[in-house]
Swiss-Prot record:
Keywords: Cytoplasm, DNA-binding, Sigma factor, Transcription, Transcription regulation. This is RNA polymerase sigma factor SigA. It comes from Chlamydia trachomatis serovar D (strain ATCC VR-885 / DSM 19411 / UW-3/Cx). Sigma factors are initiation factors that promote the attachment of RNA polymerase to specific initiation sites and are then released. This sigma factor is the primary sigma factor during exponential growth. Residues 489-542 are annotated as: Sigma-70 factor domain-4.
């Protein structure tokens, strides 16, 4: 028995020593990598540690040693964050400019914002949803919303507004059925609005008893509840409802101005009868506006304060969601560099897509926000490149065709080892060779005339282009000599013959004249001018005169004067 006891004590001591050694191994590993996972704890601890109580003791021991215990998913998330941080640091180093360069500052500041977990995304989305519900509830209290909704519904019925821009399609399964119900819904809203106005006017009666006032207020509240229920049946998008809110804020400004006017008149009404009359008129005007709004001045103020508070909460939650996903924009935008837009412009466009994704995200579908936002960010970036990257804008569908051809060319080049011909590429993609050539021509980028040519940059591309609108020195010299020689030859003719040739062929101003126009100058018939012209031309063909001009025939043929380009023979 004594030997058994000793053996048992020795085994326990060995087991405790092994446990202590394993715990030290856990602490060493945790300090090396900054944390330890549950999986690593299970691997290192001996098999005898299999009860929850023993595991809890180990976790308490590690907590006392300031060791952080994480799930494998948390570890992967940390690795991902470190990888993104390194990428951001690399991008910041590669961005050109001084330390206060906007790209560098943006990347540095963005790297300090932590990423969101799935649970945090859901929590923020719920805050946004709650704020939107409260915003809609407050806005629909006002009669302005009824008038705006009826107006928009009429536009939908008449086809003057796009259905998907006004109505939330996820809440309306049958578009045709919904449009057929709109006239009935409009009729119900108008009835309730008329009933509401009637009760509001009745409440303004100063002789109204308290029981009647309580009864009218009760009827008024029930009418408002029914009106809000009908308005929700329109299933308007959140942005449309917020447009109704703009009408509320605009009316609120006019309410405040009128209230200020009434307060100013109150101070003068006691000693000025004209001010008293204006005060009464201002109060009547205020009563009319209260009826038009469906709210008293005090109710209006209270509702607007609440509306602004919920709008601020909504914007704060959206801002938090956007700022936590700016790294996603960077990771997508960097794949589209060197395509015609600067990196900063790509980031800006991607951020706009991210904000749109925040507006449209539905957390109940179960996927992560980053999965949903990636499509919107990529869509915004690619659309911006298509619209802004080229000096001459190419339609988006043509951009897609160009990319298809370029991918096909790259694929064939990798397979064959040579640049594919238009015929080979057309056969691969199902295009005609002429269509492929046309696409290649469209895909060419314009070149700036100021683009530097050569290593020194002393010449620009425009220096090597011929300016066809300017005469060459040889051409100008040839025409100058021709004009001088023409003057000498024409001097051998009579004054009348010289005048007729000059004006008939436009040698003076480049504009030939008709026989009638020349004849009117001499007050003779067109036939007589024709005879003078024929005689003058015969003289010009005489060898003595023609040989002086024959040397210029080559110049005239080269410049194609006969095609309509006529030079005057005088400066």
């Amino acid at each position: 028995m004594r030997m058994d006891t000793l053996d048992s004590q020795a085994a326990e001591a060995a087991q405790e020593e092994e446990i202590q050694r394993k715990l030290e191994e856990l602490v060493t590993l945790a300090k090396d990598q900054g944390f330890i996972t549950y999986e690593e704890i299970n691997e290192i601890l001996p098999p005898s540690f299999d009860t929850p109580e023993q595991i809890d003791q180990v976790l308490i021991f590690l907590a006392g040693m300031d060791v952080q215990v994480l799930n494998q998913a948390d570890v992967e998330r940390q690795k991902e964050r470190k990888k993104e941080a390194k990428e951001l640091e690399g991008l910041a180093k590669r961005s050109e400019g001084t330390p206060d360069d906007p790209v560098r500052m943006y990347l540095k500041e963005m790297g300090t914002v932590p990423l969101l977990t799935r649970e945090e995304e859901v929590e923020i989305s719920k805050r946004i949803e709650k704020a939107q519900v409260q915003i809609e509830r407050i806005i629909l209290r006002f009669r302005y919303s009824t008038k705006e909704a009826v107006s928009i519904a009429q536009y939908l019925i008449n086809g003057k507004e796009r259905f998907d821009k006004i109505v939330s399609e996820k809440e309306v399964e049958d578009k045709t059925h919904f449009l057929n119900l709109l006239p009935k819904l409009i009729s119900l809203l108008k009835e309730e609005d008329a009933y509401l106005e009637e009760r509001l006017l009745a409440l303004k009666d100063p002789a109204l008893s308290k029981p009647d006032q309580a009864r009218l207020n009760d009827e008024l509240e029930k009418c408002r509840i029914r009106t809000q229920a009908y308005l929700r049946c329109f299933h308007c998008r959140h942005n449309v409802t917020e447009d109704f809110g703009e009408v509320v804020f605009k009316a609120y400004d006019s309410f405040l101005q009128l209230e200020q006017q009434i307060n100013d008149l109150k101070a003068r009404a006691e000693r000025n009868k004209f001010a008293a009359a204006k005060l009464a008129a201002a109060r009547r005007k205020l009563h009319k506006r209260e009826v038009a709004a469906g709210r008293t001045l005090e109710e209006f103020k209270k509702d607007v304060r609440m509306l602004q508070r919920w709008m601020d909460k909504s914007q704060e939650a959206k801002k938090e969601m956007v700022e936590s996903n700016l790294r996603l924009v960077i990771s997508i935008a960097k794949k589209y560099t060197n395509r015609g837009l600067s990196f900063l412009d790509l980031i800006q466009e991607g951020n706009m897509g991210l904000m749109k994704a925040v507006e449209k995200f539905e957390y109940r579908r179960g996927y992560k926000f980053s999965t949903y936002a990636t499509w919107w960010i990529r869509q915004a970036v690619t659309r911006a490149i298509a619209d802004q990257a080229r000096t001459i804008r190419i339609p988006v569908h043509m951009i897609e065709t160009i990319n298809k051809v370029l991918r096909g060319a790259k694929k064939l080049m990798m397979e064959t080892g040579k640049e594919p011909t238009p015929e080979e590429l057309g056969e691969e993609l199902g295009f005609t060779p002429d269509r492929v050539r046309e696409i290649y021509k469209i895909a060419q980028h314009p070149i700036s005339l100021q683009a530097e040519v050569g290593d020194g940059g002393e010449s620009s591309f425009g220096d090597f282009l011929e300016d066809t609108a300017v005469e060459s020195p040889a051409e100008a010299t040839g025409y100058s000599m021709l004009k001088d020689k023409m003057k000498e030859v024409l001097k051998t003719l009579t004054d009348r013959e010289r005048f007729v040739l000059i004006h008939r062929f436009g040698l003076l101003d480049g504009r030939p004249k008709t026989l009638e126009e020349v004849g009117s100058a001499f007050n003779v018939t067109r036939e007589r001018i024709r005879q003078i012209e024929a005689k003058a031309l015969r003289k010009m063909r005489h060898p003595i005169r023609s040989k002086q001009l024959r040397a210029f025939l080559d110049l005239l043929e080269e410049e194609k004067i006969g095609s309509g380009k006529i030079k005057s023979y005088k400066n």
